[in-house]
Amino acid sequence: MNKYDLIERMNTRFAELEVTLHQLHQQLDDLPLIAARVFSLPEIEKGTEHQPIEQITVNITEGEHAKRLGLQHFQRLFLHHQGQHVSSKAALRLPGVLCFSVTDKELIECQDIIKKTNQLKAELEHIITVESGLPSEQRFEFVHTHLHGLITLNTYRTITPLINPSSVRFGWANKHIIKNVTREDILLQLEKSLNAGRAVPPFTREQWRELISLEINDVQRLPEKTRLKIKRPVKVQPIARVWYQEQQKQVQHPCPMPLIAFCQRQSGAELPKLGELTDYDVKHIKHKYKPDAKPLRLLVPRLHLYVELEP
């Protein structure tokens, strides 16, 4: 597919996403609200995106006001939806849950629009991250040329429906993203960045080429069978633990935005028990089990690329 077809499809899918989000807003707004609880987190100011987070103060909102905040949050996709002092590199987060009473017909209608919304989100992410063929450092320019001010992470995030949950509790998750990669994978990624011929701030084009060339040399010097890992820290994330009494099952969901709980009237579903998200303090985190990690040596800091050392 040529570049212009790709851009046209991206713009078309985004316009469709805006329509479905508006339809979802209207559908949910018309349903009887039986409970709503959202947790506002501090905004991340420009220049502080990469600072380690040690404490987070949580503010709770309930009822109709929480519902309004939650429904608005699903449509907050652009930088102009937030203050000028807020970082454009950090996505907005509003964990919580909105609980609605529904008939079977209303549930099917809501599930259909949520499914369509999530399909459009997934397709947009695929267009931008895969079909564009661009390395990550060039996607920002590509997206903002055609959808100026779009916050891609907010756009990609899926909306999570819950059907007749018994309880919804909240907490925090601290983790790393760990991915095994091959030497060839990394060389291909680096050569793609080198051949793009662009500058990535704060580097000039020449400085960027020099940095990428050094990284390529470091990787090329490794033996072919070297075990490589990308171990990227993920900032602490709000999560929800949802319990279903009938199935005796617990499901854990990432919770960067409100979950939508549907309670079926015909089934006699009761209002789920709702927990609170407490303030986060890194000093008070307790690990139930922390396995011994294999020793690693950092090779390419920018990519969080490590060499796995033999014991």
UniProtKB/Swiss-Prot annotation:
* Swiss-Prot/TrEMBL GO biological process terms: DNA replication termination
Its source organism is: Yersinia pseudotuberculosis serotype I (strain IP32953)
Organism lineage reads as: Bacteria, Pseudomonadati, Pseudomonadota, Gammaproteobacteria, Enterobacterales
A GO term, aspect molecular function: DNA binding
What Pfam families has UniProt attached to this entry? Ter
Q: Does the keyword Cell membrane apply?
A: no
Any idea what job this protein has? Trans-acting protein required for termination of DNA replication. Binds to DNA replication terminator sequences (terA to terF) to prevent the passage of replication forks. The termination efficiency will be affected by the affinity of this protein for the terminator sequence.
A single GO cellular-component term from the record reads: cytoplasm
**The entry's keywords:** Cytoplasm, DNA replication, DNA-binding
Task: Provide the protein's localization.
Answer: Cytoplasm
Q: Say yes or no: keyword Calcium present.
A: no
Protein family:
Belongs to the Tus family.
Question: What start-end ranges are recorded for coiled-coil regions in this protein?
Answer: none
Q: What is this protein called?
A: DNA replication terminus site-binding protein
Look up the domain of life of the source.
Answer: Bacteria
